[in-house]
């Protein structure tokens, strides 16, 4: 009886530890944050190509959605540490209807915005996508033409 109980407890412990590891293990060089994993990719892409790259990377991946100052600060530090090129970084915020109604590509909702001063300004009536602006240390947002080429930040559910 004692051997059976010991074996059962060992199997239960192994199952629980494997299950926990599977639910929230980010790959190496990804940043774990609030149940998601984030990675900055240095290869410049348009906003749409960056979004499609994230989606193809793994089911449940999109361009990153930012919902709090604390998360933005951690992600800005991560980008500064890992980005291999200079430049602003696409995030998942865009205006697909071109009516100044900003939505996240993962369809999440938020009242949080971190626009740089004077933004969004829709310069030349063609800025419908959003990047983390490099001159602000990746803390503030700027609207930009979606066809511009920038590195990008993916978020994935693991």
Curated annotation (Swiss-Prot):
Disulfide-linked positions: 26-37, 54-154, 61-156, 129-146
Pfam families given in the database record: Lectin_C (PF00059)
Gene3D superfamilies, per database record: Mannose-Binding Protein A, subunit A (3.10.100.10)
Domain of life: Eukaryota
Cellular location(s): Secreted
Signal peptide (UniProt feature, chain positions): 1-23
Keyword Acetylation listed: no
Positions that bind Ca(2+): 127, 142-143
Family according to the record: Belongs to the true venom lectin family.
Subunit and partners: Dimer. Probably non-covalently linked.
Protein name: C-type lectin BML-2
């Amino acid at each position: 009886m004692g051997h059976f109980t010991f074996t059962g407890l060992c199997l239960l412990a192994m199952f629980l530890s494997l299950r926990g590891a599977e639910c929230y293990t980010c790959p190496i060089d990804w940043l774990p944050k609030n149940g998601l994993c984030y990675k900055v990719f240095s290869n410049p892409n348009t906003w749409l190509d960056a979004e499609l790259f994230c989606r193809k990377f793994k089911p449940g991946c999109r361009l990153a959605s930012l919902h709090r100052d604390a998360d933005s600060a951690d992600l800005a530090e991560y980008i500064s540490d890992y980005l291999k090129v200079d430049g602003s970084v696409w995030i998942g915020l865009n205006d697909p209807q071109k009516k100044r109604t900003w939505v996240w590509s993962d369809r999440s909702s938020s009242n949080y915005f971190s626009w740089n001063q004077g933004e969004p300004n829709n310069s030349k009536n063609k800025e419908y996508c959003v990047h983390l602006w490099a001159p602000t240390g990746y803390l503030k947002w700027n609207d930009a033409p979606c066809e511009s080429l920038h590195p990008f930040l993916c978020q994935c559910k693991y």
